């Protein structure tokens, strides 16, 4: 148990040490006027929240309709599809949104197909980011892009992203090549 606590503390402090300090985080509950800017496939990443251990690493979800996110938020919940307004309602959270530069109509159709195929899984931290047996928030988001790009033989997607990592943290998604930050202000 002592080693598990030490491991969690080390992961907590190292999981996002290389994040660009200039990244423009937007207060989550103030971007109501940005809802029209979201598109299917946009990745939403919430900042870390130190008071809640479930949020120590941040949180990630993906837009699955123009007004709804899809996510695996916590143990016992499985897949949840929720209104983005409700998802952003937390007062003390900040958000960054990312968009894949090559998200065209063909990619979108296959992406939504993969969303539907991966809805009925259980939440579980897995050390195989390529597995679709279980999902956790950021691995689910990454896996959707990985699977869709693989299905379409997309040469623009970095299949070797975090190649040697067993876990994809929410903040890791901020480093995905060919994704741009969406201005939410």
Q: Across the structure, where does each feature detected by a protein language model lie?
A:
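Hydrophobic h-region of N-terminal signal peptides that target proteins for export
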Residues: 9-17
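Sec-exported extracytoplasmic/periplasmic mature domains
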Residues: 49, 116-120, 142-150
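Sec-dependent signal peptide recognition
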Residues: 2-9
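Glycine-rich catalytic cores of cysteine/serine-nucleophile enzymes that process amide/ester linkages
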Residues: 38-101, 123-132
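Activation targets extended, charge/polar-rich intrinsically disordered C-terminal tails
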Residues: 17-23, 127-185
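A structural motif
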Residues: 93, 101-120
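Extracytoplasmic/secreted envelope proteins and their assembly/folding machinery
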Residues: 38-42, 58, 108-112, 138, ...
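Short, surface-exposed secondary-structure edge patches
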Residues: 29-37
């Amino acid at each position: 148990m002592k080693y598990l606590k030490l491991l969690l503390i080390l992961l907590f402090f190292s999981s996002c040490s290389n994040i660009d300090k200039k990244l423009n985080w937007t207060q989550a509950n103030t971007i109501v006027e940005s809802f029209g800017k979201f598109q299917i496939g946009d990745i939403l990443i919430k900042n870390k929240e130190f008071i809640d251990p479930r949020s120590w690493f941040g949180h990630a979800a993906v837009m699955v309709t123009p007004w709804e996110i899809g996510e695996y938020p916590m143990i016992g919940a499985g897949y949840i599809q929720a209104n983005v307004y409700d998802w952003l309602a937390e007062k003390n959270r900040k958000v960054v949104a990312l968009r894949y530069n090559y998200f065209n109509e063909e990619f979108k159709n296959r992406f939504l197909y993969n969303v539907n195929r991966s809805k009925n899984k259980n939440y579980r931290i897995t050390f195989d980011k390529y597995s679709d047996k279980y999902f956790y928030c950021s691995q689910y988001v990454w896996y959707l892009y990985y699977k869709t790009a693989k299905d379409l033989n997309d040469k623009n997607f970095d299949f070797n992203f975090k190649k040697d990592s067993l876990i994809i943290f929410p903040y890791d998604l901020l480093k995905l090549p060919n994704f741009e930050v969406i201005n939410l202000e």
